[in-house]
Amino acid sequence: AAKCPKLVSPAMNTGMLENPITQDNLKTLEHYGFAVIPSESGLLACKDVGSGRLPREDVLIEYILHTIARPKDLAGVRIAVTAGPTQEPLDPVRYLTNHSTGKMGYAVARAAAMRGADVTLIHGETALPPVKFTTDVPVTSARQMYEAVTSRFDATDVLIMAAAVADYRPATVAADKVKKHDGEMSIALERTEDILAWVGAHKPEKLFVCGFSMETRDLIENSTAKLKKKNMDMIVANNLKVPGAGFGVDTNVVTIITGQGITELPLQSKDGVAGHIADAIANK
């Protein structure tokens, strides 16, 4: 009789869970609006190993938060988020990359998904667990990220470019490991695909584009120039010299710049910053 959202987390022996009757009953519950939290695999109470294990508490909480804790003001909005670094190979052993961990982009993807958006997370190599309630698209290089973004361009309402994409890659990739020699070594570099420039040049009026900038000086001036040059609607500016901001930390200090004004945010968690970004998108 309850009218509130209802979640079910089945936990049982693998044979019971995989029984067709159980599976039919779970489908019936979903048909009537129940959210079924997938069981995990592992050691069960009966000492068997298999599916049917109750998910960890943090996983259950994630599902509960997704169901009841946030307004679904982004429901139906198709959002693509890029996150993390790219890797540009030099040889089979080495590559050029940067210090990005992907934490900011992942936080944005999670915030948007929690508010009902249809989120695609396009990301480079990270040590982070997948973001639930999103479509996961792993890539490695700038070229792969370019292809992932452009191939989904027409099916996107909001594009949030939080990835730290390499500007240059080795002009040639050695087939074998480059051996150490006496003296210096020079590496010829070439430009990678400028994803934001392509997006700005092909941007339809309906598409909302948010970029990120990392600066060490003239934060507002340089970021505003990038906003205009790349034809973006919003840019999130980071000053890497501010304590608690930038790569590898769980906090950030950002300035959100749009054509309507500038909003400076104090030091806070990256989840908090992501919430402000989601607010800006919901209110656009």
Q: For each of these PLM feature ranges, what is it?
A:
Residues 1-13, 28, 182-198:
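Short, acidic/small-residue loops that bind anionic groups at enzyme active sites
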Residues 3-43, 50-64, 205-234:
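Short, glycine-/small-residue-rich phosphate/pyrophosphate-handling segment
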Residues 16-19, 90-97, 168-180, 185-190, ...:
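Glycine/threonine-rich flexible loop motifs
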Residues 23, 27-28, 73-141:
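Glycine-rich phosphate/diphosphate-binding loop of Rossmann-like nucleotide-binding domains
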Residues 41-77, 97, 241-284:
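Glycine-rich phosphate/pyrophosphate-binding loop and the adjoining helix
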Residues 42, 84-88, 126, 163-170, ...:
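Short glycine-rich anion-binding loops that position phosphate/pyrophosphate groups of nucleotides
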Residues 97-115, 178-197, 231-237, 267, ...:
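Gly/Ser/Thr-rich active-site loops/lids in small-molecule metabolic enzymes
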Residues 124-125, 133-197, 201:
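A glycine- and small/hydrophobic-rich beta-loop-beta segment
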